[in-house]
Amino acid sequence: MISLSALVKPKDGIHSVRLLEKSLRDHYENVPVRDHQYLVRFADGPALVTDELAGLRVDVVVSDERAASHFREALASEIATRVLGRTVDVVWSRSATVPAPLR
């Protein structure tokens, strides 16, 4: 299992990240976990979305490198579709620990 995190930060103001967050919640089934955090059910499984002050964090657990690559591509597509012309930076990292809501 691979635990991936994406930190999505705006280049031109926080509005682009807030737009992405709202769009994900409107478009996909989601369940609140706690304040500013919820699980979003993507086609490939759940992702933990956390609203942080400087951006949006998306955590996911995948089975292998192929699935990791697929999720990166899927999130990039979601961002391109939902943010529409606004620019954001996405920084990927891996973690040895899995966030509790994804266990």
Model-assigned labels for residue ranges:
Residues S16-R18, T50, A68-H70, A100:
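Short acidic, gly/pro-rich beta-turn/loop elements at beta-sheet edges
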Residues Y38-G45, R94-R103:
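Polar/charged, Gly/Pro-rich intrinsically disordered segments
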Residues L19-Q37:
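Short, flexible N-terminal segments of the mature chain
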Residues S63-P99:
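C-terminal structural segments of small proteins and small subunits
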Residues M1-D12, S16-L24:
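Short glycine-/aliphatic-rich beta-strand segments at the starts of folded cytosolic domains
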Residues M1-S3, L53-G55, G85:
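A general secondary-structure signal for short beta-strands and their flanking turns/coil
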Residues S3-L7, R41, D89-V91:
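Ser/Thr- (and often Asn-) enriched beta-sheet segments in non-cytosolic proteins
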Residues P32-R66:
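Short, intrinsically disordered low-complexity segments
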